[in-house]
C-alpha cells in the first residue's frame, strides 16, 4: 500500500506552479524500480530521468514524504 503525506500531496501543486509536472504513477514507478536507493532513516529512491523520492517503509506500507526533480 502506497500513500502520500499531506506535504507530498501539496508538492504536486508547488511544482506545477513552476511548470514542473509529475504524476502519482511516476512517483510510484520510481519506488517500484529505482536506479539507486539509499537509506538514512528514510529511503531515498532516484531515477536517472530526474526524479528523487523520499519515503518510509513499514512492512507493506510505503509513505511518500516528498519528491523533487534533479538534473
Locate the predicted segments by residue:
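Ribonuclease/tRNase effector modules and their secretory precursors
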Residues: 1-71
